[in-house]
């Protein structure tokens, strides 16, 4: 069997199995695809593909299904990620625009990607090692109670209510906010802790206790902003794909619940020349994802943070890759540089 025909037969098997969920036989391939050869020749071709470990027979079925190795060869032969339709692009644009709140943008993003792919969608919060302080706000709730708000240029908003240890008037708190913001605006979050002592020491002794409490709160908020987190949507799609996880869907749900597993996997996935990364079945380092595939890409500055989907290995890879990459590009555009 020639290499082009091998790839053509494999492609036909993958496409039929993805859409039908049924093992694929030689007769069905001849009827549905213009392969230009007889059913007997296709049977021989399928036997050769099985010998190479690219397809396998589930139980005693007469048909064949792709293996992880077969899916990998199929995915690697996708020369370029196809663009989405104009209607799909308009839908993405209209759903993602119109919000400046990072949490809202990411929540919309995963819900949209889940709807486009019928898979579980996940997105890492932006990596904030280079994020800068855009705004600081202190709101007096009671004479000693203050709401501290820290906003980064990435869109992250962190807030915390603290006891400043002394009574403060509105004008005194406003003066402290002006001093903190005037000194710290534009400071990288990663360097905030080193910059705070100078601000505190510049405050009059009578307000230094409050200034120290405010500085401590800002340091905690900056640390919270830099923690690796993710948001996801579409776990119900896994339940509808229960047949695709013959061993158990439990380990897949556990991997999603244990965010550290997904975050580590996303961080380790390297994009290829098409701008996406695909990890199939047992290629995943976590055993619980042996029956799942992950398609991801980077977004934002330097494409460090990842967005992607998780689903069964029986997946429409071309359309999924296109949706992931398109949504990532719109997300990058909305969040800006």
Swiss-Prot record:
Provide the GO biological process annotations: negative regulation of DNA-templated transcription
> What domain of life does the native source organism fall in?
Bacteria
Q: Which Pfam families match?
A: HrcA (PF01628), HTH_DeoR (PF08220)
UniProt KW Cell division keyword: no
Sorted keywords for this record are: Repressor, Stress response, Transcription, Transcription regulation
A GO MF label: DNA binding
The answer to keyword Transcription applying to this record is yes
Role:
Negative regulator of class I heat shock genes (grpE-dnaK-dnaJ and groELS operons). Prevents heat-shock induction of these operons.
Q: Which family does it belong to?
A: Belongs to the HrcA family.
Name listed for the protein in its UniProt record: Heat-inducible transcription repressor HrcA
Q: Which organism is it from?
A: Pseudarthrobacter chlorophenolicus (strain ATCC 700700 / DSM 12829 / CIP 107037 / JCM 12360 / KCTC 9906 / NCIMB 13794 / A6)
Primary gene name: hrcA
């Amino acid at each position: 069997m020639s290499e082009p025909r091998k790839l053509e037969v494999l492609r036909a098997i993958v496409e039929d199995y993805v859409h039908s969920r049924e093992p694929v036989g030689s007769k069905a391939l001849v009827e549905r695809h213009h392969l230009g050869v007889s059913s007997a020749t296709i049977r021989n071709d399928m036997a050769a593909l099985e010998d190479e470990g690219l397809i396998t027979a589930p139980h005693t079925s007469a048909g064949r299904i792709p293996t992880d190795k077969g899916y990998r060869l199929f995915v690697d032969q996708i020369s370029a990620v196809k663009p989405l339709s104009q209607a799909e692009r308009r839908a993405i644009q209209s759903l993602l625009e119109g919000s400046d709140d990072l949490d809202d943008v990411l929540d919309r993003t995963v819900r949209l990607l889940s709807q486009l792919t019928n898979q579980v969608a996940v997105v890492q919060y932006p990596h904030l090692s280079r994020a800068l302080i855009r705004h600081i706000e202190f709101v007096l709730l009671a004479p000693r109670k203050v709401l501290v708000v820290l906003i980064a240029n990435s869109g992250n908003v962190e807030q915390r209510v603290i006891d400043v240890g002394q009574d403060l008037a509105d004008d005194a708190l406003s003066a402290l906010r002006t001093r903190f913001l005037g000194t710290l605006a534009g400071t990288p979050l990663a360097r905030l802790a080193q910059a705070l002592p100078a601000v505190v020491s510049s405050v009059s002794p009578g307000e230094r206790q409050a200034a120290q409490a405010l500085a401590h709160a800002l340091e905690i908020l900056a640390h919270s902003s830099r923690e690796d987190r993710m948001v996801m949507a579409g776990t119900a799609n896994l339940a509808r794909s229960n047949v695709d996880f013959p061993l158990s869907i439990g380990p897949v749900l556990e991997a999603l619940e244990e965010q550290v597993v997904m975050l580590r996997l996303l961080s380790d996935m390297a994009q290829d020349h098409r701008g996406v990364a695909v990890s199939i079945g047992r290629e995943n380092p976590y055993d619980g994802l042996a029956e799942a595939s992950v398609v991801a890409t980077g977004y934002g500055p330097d494409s460090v943070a990842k967005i992607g989907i998780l689903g069964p290995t029986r997946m429409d890879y071309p359309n999924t890759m296109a949706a992931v990459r398109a949504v990532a590009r719109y997300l990058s555009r909305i969040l800006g540089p």
